[in-house]
Amino acid sequence: MKRTVVWVKWADAHTSESGWLDIDQYEDDGETIVDTVGFLISYPDDGSKKDHITVWQTLCDGDGIHAMHIPVGMVRSMVVLNPPSN
């Protein structure tokens, strides 16, 4: 089965500088945007997760490795790199 390959840009949770900070001096540096590319598995298909965009790094004969489950609220964009064909 051919799978759709996607490029997902999403906002990751992140920490501020290490150590003690003066809260009054803290500056918001915006979102940390991450790029993920892989095989899209849509919910409710096996290997997916509800309310998430699920992207697998590698698929082979029904097995997969390195699934990334990205909460839909964190997704900023998604581009289909190759539409599936039969």
Where are these regions (language model features)?
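Conserved RNA-binding domains used in RNP assembly and mRNA/RNA metabolism
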Residues: 2-86
